Regions:
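C-terminal binding/interaction regions
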Residues: 2-23, 71-137
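Short solvent-exposed loop/turn micro-motifs enriched in small/polar/acidic residues
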Residues: 25-27
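Short beta-strand scaffold segments in enzyme catalytic cores
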Residues: 29-36, 109
Length: 137
């Protein structure tokens, strides 16, 4: 994706959301901003637990919040990591959840506070989601 300015505001919302992350163990805050089909945005943050398996990532928090609000059509997601100098992509669990609720061509933007950013699609971060393709048939 070449037109990064198209996602600047969404990325800024993710970066702002990251300030509210609860990360007392890793000190690695993450924010996500999920654009809905009506143009509104729902944010999420990572929420850690000392039992790391119970931690919830920012991407899933945003998606689960939107679903709890009765929203199910998402057009783009931005993920911001202010505590890293490099972009950090979604974990495997988040890739699975993102692919469950977003189309393969939906934009995914992730980046750091250093200005490094990667722009791709759901299919780019989860290229072998055959289950999604089967469900569409």
């Amino acid at each position: 994706m070449k037109d990064s300015s198209k996602y600047d505001h969404l990325f800024e919302q993710a970066m702002e959301a990251a300030k509210n992350a609860y990360a007392p163990y890793s000190h690695f805050r993450v924010g996500a901003a999920l654009r809905l089909d009506d143009g509104s945005v729902v944010t999420g943050v990572n929420v850690e637990n000392r039992s790391y398996g119970l931690t919830n990532c920012a991407e899933r928090t945003a998606i689960f919040r939107a679903i709890a609000m009765g929203k199910k059509n998402f057009t783009a997601i931005a993920i911001a990591t202010p505590d890293a100098d490099y972009p950090v992509g979604p974990c495997g669990a988040c890739r699975q959840v993102i692919s469950e609720f977003m189309q393969p061509d939906a934009p995914v933007v992730f980046g750091s506070s250093a200005g490094n950013r990667i722009e791709t699609t759901v299919g780019g971060v989860y290229p072998f989601d055959s289950l999604h393709e089967l469900q569409q048939k």
